[in-house]
C-alpha cells in the first residue's frame, strides 16, 4: 500500500510503499478514502521541537480519516466489512479509573494515532474497533474525514448552553469556523469570531457569523458596541492558543460568563485572575472529543442540516501531498483534504 511516512527524525515526509496491514483480534482494517491535514501533521512534517521529543520514527502519520471497513479481527463484535467509518484518533488504555467509568476522553494514558502509533495517511489503516464511528446515514467522505476536528469544535461549542446567548470565538482556523457553525445552528443569538487573517475572517463570514473581527485593527469591545451589546459575552470559545486572546476575552465577558478553552498556548502566561473571580467566570479546558457522546452529537447536527462544506477549501490527491501541506501551512485556507482513492 502507499503511505505517507516520517522515515527519519528530520524534516519532510515520504510517500512510499508498505505491506498492507492485518488486524489484531480487536482491530479493524479500513480502506482509507479521504484524510484531513491537521496542525499536528504540520508539526511532524517540519520536525519541530515537539515532534522531535514525541514522535517515533519511522511512522505512518495522520489521524483524520474516513473509509470503508475491509477486514475485522476475530474478536470484533459490531463493525462489519463494508461499513463506512470515521476514526477516533485518541487511543485510550481502557483500564484507568476514567476509562472504566466511561470517561474515556479523560484517560491519562491517551496515545495518538499517527503520533505514537502508525496512522491513517495511507491506503489502509488499522485501529481498534472501539475507535471507529460507523456512519448509519450518508455523510460526504470529505466531511466524514474531518470528524476528529469537527468533534473538537462540537465538544467546545456545546460544553456550555448557547441557546439565546452571545458567543465569542477567538481564532478562525478550521476548528473555530466549525465551532461557529455549531453555535449558530444550536441557537446562539450573536456569534462573533476574531482573527488577524482577513482570509480566514472572510471564510467566517461565509459560514454565517454575525461579526468577523480583525483584532489587529479592532478591539472586541468595539464589536460589542456594533452589535448593541452592553453586558459582555455569555459564552466564549478560545481556540487560537494566543495569550492575548484569552486576556481580551476575559475583559469582555459578562458576569457569570463561561469560557471553553481548546487552544493550546506555546508557553505559560499570566491572566487577570481577579477579573475571573470578581466576574465569577467559569474557565473549562477542552481536549479532544467525549467518546462517543460528541460523535453522536456530530451525526445529529449533520442530519439536522448543519453545513460544513464552506470549511473545506482545498482537495488534493495523495500524490500531491507536498503541495497540500504547503497550502495548509500557508494558512490561506480552511480544511485541506487528501484523496487516497486516486493513483
From Swiss-Prot:
Keywords: Cytoplasm, Metal-binding, NAD, Oxidoreductase, Zinc. It catalyses: L-threonine + NAD(+) = (2S)-2-amino-3-oxobutanoate + NADH + H(+). GO terms for cellular component: cytoplasm. Its main location: cytoplasm. Zn(2+) 1 binds at residues 38, 63-64. Pathway: Amino-acid degradation; L-threonine degradation via oxydo-reductase pathway; glycine from L-threonine: step 1/2. NAD(+) binds at residues 175, 195, 200, 262-264, 286-287. One of its GO terms (biological process) is L-threonine catabolic process to glycine. PANTHER family: L-THREONINE 3-DEHYDROGENASE. Catalyzes the NAD(+)-dependent oxidation of L-threonine to 2-amino-3-ketobutyrate. Belongs to the zinc-containing alcohol dehydrogenase family. Homotetramer. This is L-threonine 3-dehydrogenase. It comes from Saccharopolyspora erythraea (strain ATCC 11635 / DSM 40517 / JCM 4748 / NBRC 13426 / NCIMB 8594 / NRRL 2338).
Amino acid at each position: 500500500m502507499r503511505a505517507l511516512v516520517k522515515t527519519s527524525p528530520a524534516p519532510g515526509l515520504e510517500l512510499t510503499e508498505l505491506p498492507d496491514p492485518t488486524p489484531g483480534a480487536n482491530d479493524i482494517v479500513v480502506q482509507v478514502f479521504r484524510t484531513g491535514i491537521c496542525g499536528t501533521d504540520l508539526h511532524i512534517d517540519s520536525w519541530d521541537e515537539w515532534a522531535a521529543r514525541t514522535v517515533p520514527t519511522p511512522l505512518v502519520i495522520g489521524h483524520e480519516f474516513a473509509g470503508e471497513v475491509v477486514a475485522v479481527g476475530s474478536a470484533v463484535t459490531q463493525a462489519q466489512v463494508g461499513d463506512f467509518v470515521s476514526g477516533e484518533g485518541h487511543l485510550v488504555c481502557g483500564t484507568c479509573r476514567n476509562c472504566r467509568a466511561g470517561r474515556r476522553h479523560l484517560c491519562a494514558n491517551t496515545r495518538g494515532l499517527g503520533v505514537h502509533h502508525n496512522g491513517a495517511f495511507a491506503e489502509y489503516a488499522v485501529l481498534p474497533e472501539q475507535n471507529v464511528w460507523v456512519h448509519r446515514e450518508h455523510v460526504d467522505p470529505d466531511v466524514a474525514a474531518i470528524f476528529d476536528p469537527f468533534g473538537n469544535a462540537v465538544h467546545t461549542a456545546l460544553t456550555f448552553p448557547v441557546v439565546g446567548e452571545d458567543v465569542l470565538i477567538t481564532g478562525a482556523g478550521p476548528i473555530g469556523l466549525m465551532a461557529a457553525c455549531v453555535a449558530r445552528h444550536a441557537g446562539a443569538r450573536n456569534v462573533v469570531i476574531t482573527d488577524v487573517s482577513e482570509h480566514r475572517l472572510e471564510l467566517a463570514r461565509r459560514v454565517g457569523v454575525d461579526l468577523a473581527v480583525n483584532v489587529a485593527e479592532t478591539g472586541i469591545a468595539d464589536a460589542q458596541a456594533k452589535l448593541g451589546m452592553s453586558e459582555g459575552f455569555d459564552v466564549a470559545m478560545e481556540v487560537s492558543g494566543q495569550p492575548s486572546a484569552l486576556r481580551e476575552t476575559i475583559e469582555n465577558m459578562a458576569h457569570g460568563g463561561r469560557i471553553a478553552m481548546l487552544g493550546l498556548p506555546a508557553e505559560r502566561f499570566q491572566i487577570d485572575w481577579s477579573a475571573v473571580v470578581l466576574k465569577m467566570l467559569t474557565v473549562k479546558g477542552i481536549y479532544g472529543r467525549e467518546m462517543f457522546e460528541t460523535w453522536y452529537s456530530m451525526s445529529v447536527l449533520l442530519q439536522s442540516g448543519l453545513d460544513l462544506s464552506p470549511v473545506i477549501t482545498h482537495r488534493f490527491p495523495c500524490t500531491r501531498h507536498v503541495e497540500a501541506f504547503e497550502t495548509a501551512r500557508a494558512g490561506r485556507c480552511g480544511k485541506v483534504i487528501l484523496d487516497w482513492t486516486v493513483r
